[in-house]
Amino acid sequence: MRSRSIPSVVHEVKRLSSEGVREFNLIAQDSSFYGRDLNDGTTLARLLKELVKIDNVKWIRLFYLYPTYFDDELLEIITKEEKICKYVDIPLQHISDSVLRRMHRRDSSQSIKKLLKKLRNTTPYITIRTTLMVGFPGETEADFKELLTFIKAVKFDNMGAFTYSAQDGT
């Protein structure tokens, strides 16, 4: 899969909004990575800056924003633009550094906690949803307890919790 160009997405949103669509959900395996594969400076924040200019667009929702590419430019546009819903779905999966490494995640517990704190401090009325996984191969009792402590401390607005199940390629 490759990211579509900003003009391509803008064209489609304009067409749909002219047909009466008012809410747009941007969904990808990792929406925060959008555009980086094009190697031309395209980012999700830059796409959003174009989409909010479309008159008939009322709401834009963002799904599956992994922490690795959730940068300050993206945070700023989410915070400032009224058309962008103050709801983010960040599938963290775990908080233990040892589990995150085994999952081949690029983020650390420290970087995740820093992002969540920044989200709450910058946009205090934001709704944060996450998905967490337990039972990943090699997860210890200490890893699990660290995850529970983290959940209690962060107080997610919505959360899905699932047990690990092997998938092809994982």
Where do the language-model regions lie?
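ATP/adenylate-binding site constellation spanning eukaryotic-like Ser/Thr protein kinases
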Residues: 6, 89, 161
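Conserved SAM/AdoMet-binding glycine-rich loop
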Residues: 18-144
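Canonical Radical SAM [4Fe-4S] cluster-binding loop centered on the CxxxCxxC motif
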Residues: 1-10
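C-terminal, non-catalytic macromolecule-binding modules
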Residues: 142-170
